[in-house]
């Protein structure tokens, strides 16, 4: 009969952690945890050990039976009037403390969904009076944070946990945990985050197990029950969505421009597409949607976002340049997004073009041409000369047919925000790619914590349209604020429903932001106490939210263990007077990307001596900040050998001490040299010279073959025959790389 480790530990009144050590060190039994099973021979061996130690009487231990508790389904709670208190429904009431804890955690982790109740049989045909009951808040049962198995308490560890929350789960006072950590040399507060390893170490003292559990976040639509199931009859063929990827200046935008026969290249800076745009073209009566993603590696996240909404990735590689770093990066994003890749070998019109080299280099990254037995289509094109563009479009349409892409235009629309901005005359504008349904003028829409009503739709040519169907990109005017790029947009039944959803999203994000800010403030305080860590404060301004996100991520990646970038504030729009005042208070530098400071901001910056740096090229900004951070690094020094001196005779000089008569046998010695004294090849002292003389005169430098006299700082035990090594410490310029 098998017995669990914790049962024997309980029997001998020993803590699980100590019991495991005894098993391993003293008895020779290795187990993984308190819940491990022991066979009869092992149990007898343990009993014999403790019998010899004369610790406790041996008692028969019966294995604990596991009783599975039936989970009760959480009831559906309707949203009542604001003054109605429905707190406490659907939560465990086993005991007051546990009920309170369970209630708090469920409120935090339950997934909230909204349902429409207007079609239920019970309410059909009845006129509702009083408060609204057609809008239901449904709670989905969440996994409990604390469970008990075989008499052992198990805490589920999800993501980040504060010390206070962990103490509550353990059922002990926070002060006790703080004291334990203090004795281990860790100073934490009740709001400090704790790591998984810290939690495991602490829990072992209380015979509690920690089980790591990955958080599974439902997306926006699942949380609020906005996803509508498609009927097979409604699914029709839809245009493919294409993302163009590749290295800087390999011709991505030029290729798209050639396909569209419009000029969007001229206004760009530094050869890089700075914003995501989406456009549609037509080939043989079929439409193709192109998403043009930025080409520089700093826009990694924006490119990844483009790959997530795309069906096919076009990898543009210059025939005269071959595979480059951003080419490899683009391949990775396409593979993560699990989308097929078509390689467009561009610039074949150039004399130095070598398409064969491109194919060979891409083979090393898993892209094998269909001609060579692989599954990747290679199309040789020239955007400049408009060579074989039809062949590329045909390849796209053939690939789309194989994928059997379908969409439903007969339901409420769902889309993704590709880009957003605030127009001073029109207001908030969002570039939306419709992914499901049909978006119409007058639709009530929600994207993240922003809502609105569609006032106008503009297609990629800037023409007003009444609706947008699946895979169609449009500019949407009507949001009450600027939505975040990457947010999913949904059409909601009415404005009341939209408002309630936005309120829930706002509350949820506010909780997350508050938690992040608290942790950030604490870590900031710790950093200031830690003198070895230096910080560069920045305020960021850019022309759009997507650019802000890309710039922030690029700059934060420059941080390391010694120097850190701290983003005090980041937003889209012009640099304002308030930005300058904030920078002055925080000791920050203001960075502007594709934006300029206002007149008032410039005057304020001049008075307060706040530095403002602006650029239209993102990598110029990152290079400047990288140089600034490198200057903040503590200098590194390298020892540089100067020479070797042999002591011939030591003279005692009153009021001065011992002076050595020497000869420089190799290299040279300077009057400010660092030295080490060797006796029988053993270093007996290391320090600096106090004096260096030649013919009774002070000397700055003595070279090999010359005699000299020297005195050593704070050392008088020089003897004949000692050897002195002279060296200097040379500062080595450091970089962040």
Curated annotation (Swiss-Prot):
Domain tr-type G per the UniProt entry, residue ranges:
237-404
Q: Where is the composition biased (Basic and acidic residues)?
A: 69-80
Write out the transmembrane intervals.
none
Report residue spans for region: G5: 382-384
UniProt-listed Gene3D superfamilies: 1.10.10.2480, P-loop containing nucleotide triphosphate hydrolases (3.40.50.300), Translation factors (2.40.30.10), Translation initiation factor IF- 2, domain 3 (3.40.50.10050)
Region G4: start-end pairs: 346-349
Keywords, in A-Z order: Cytoplasm, GTP-binding, Initiation factor, Nucleotide-binding, Protein biosynthesis
What is the protein's name according to its record?
Translation initiation factor IF-2
Species the sequence originates in: Fusobacterium nucleatum subsp. nucleatum (strain ATCC 25586 / DSM 15643 / BCRC 10681 / CIP 101130 / JCM 8532 / KCTC 2640 / LMG 13131 / VPI 4355)
Q: What is the lineage of its organism?
A: Bacteria, Fusobacteriati, Fusobacteriota, Fusobacteriia, Fusobacteriales
